[in-house]
């Protein structure tokens, strides 16, 4: 069974919950991950926001992979500028372990940048 943590909802099995933040606060996030484990979830697909990275909401979690689709100017109200926003997103890929994968969209000009310091197995698409 798989789980989902996204902007739209949190779901696993037949359970569905509203989600109010793309990446919930660390306590809420771990509560749902624990419930998923108890329900038999083996994998969780999680949307990780730049806010979640910057505010350490995912600190301590070990990801088996990450997917970069694109960067837009969506969160410049929170981040000082586009470079800061991009660098925060890059921290996620920098933190992936060697055993993880990084799947990157090369159609986005920031794709290659995300891979620069990542030790994860690298895959690309365009």
Model-derived features: positions:
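Acidic, Mg2+-coordinating active-site environments of NTP-dependent enzymes
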Residues: 64-126
